[in-house]
Amino acid sequence: MSGNTIKVVPVIMAGGAGTRLWPLSREEKPKQFHDLSGEGTLLEQTIKRLLPLHPESCVIVTARSYEEASYAELGRIGIKGTVLSEPRPRNTAAAVLYAAAYLSRIYTDSIMVVLPADHHIRKPDEFADVLRLAVAEALKGNLATIGVKPLYPETGCGYIKASPGTGEAFPVDSFVEKPDLATARRYLEEGSYYWNSGIYAWKTSVILDRFARYLPRHHDAFTPLFALDNADIASSTGKAWEIKRAVFDAVESISIDYGIMEKTDGRMVVPGDFGWGDLGSWNSIDDILPADAEGNRSPSGQRAIFVGARDCSVFAEDKRIAVVGLSNVVVVQSGGDILVMEKDASQRVREVVDIVRSLDSGGRS
């Protein structure tokens, strides 16, 4: 976009450690910097699917330890961008406010398109169309969120209930927490509930106004950042870094949904069906991998061998893995660590991570 047209700036949340995908995803190299499907890293794919918006640049909010890797991703794609390093994780409200503070120094106003770096989108063209609709809502001064049309009764994500309306965007009635199975089935039947994708679009000026209204402690705590110049607000060294550490120490860990979106007016949901998946567990990775005739899966190019196996998945960083006579099992190899797990137990990987941390720090299991 050029001239006096308001700029659209993607803001990508890329700070999570993704420990539920251990041992491949670790604090030193989390999932957003891995190629899980043979199509590029998750962060790379996220940036590329935003290119139809023709952004002049983008912002990546991440941890200081991932700053270099984030700039490397931008360089490979050939798009200008700024990496904002958080001194410590404080959830999505602080990350959004940090990006808004930075953008308010660069532009008179801008449209922030906020999204996580760990999603998979099977229909990028349809996704781009939905993003354009969300940007159009943001230009009206609304806070737009993208809802995914549910395909089945999902209990692992939150939902957005839409109010009746006409057109391609609807007022938000409410945000609802992860339901039980019976409730999820009812949501699917009613047709007015959408999966909460965690993707948003709004004017920088509008979201700053909402922070002042609904999260004034966050807004006040970030005041020193608004006084920094453009270079210092993005710096991860020196006095500016110490200022940012004090700012992040002063705010609670609050999500943008809980802190603002559940309370504010002007909320619009833009529904879409674009093959969305939240890659938060090993079970969810199955959705992005090709399967053989027996339902066994492995990223293209990996040397997995399946003999008499059914519905098994293998992710091998640099070893040949053979699975014989097993079913419904995930095998993951990364470095010197191997995970062997029934698919139904994917939520227990966090327990393994806790034990590994204890062992690595000299504790006992």
Residue ranges, per PLM feature:
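Short coil/turn connectors at secondary-structure junctions
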Residues: 6-8, 55-56, 79-80, 107-110, ...
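Conserved core of the sugar-phosphate nucleotidyltransferase
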Residues: 124-248, 268, 343
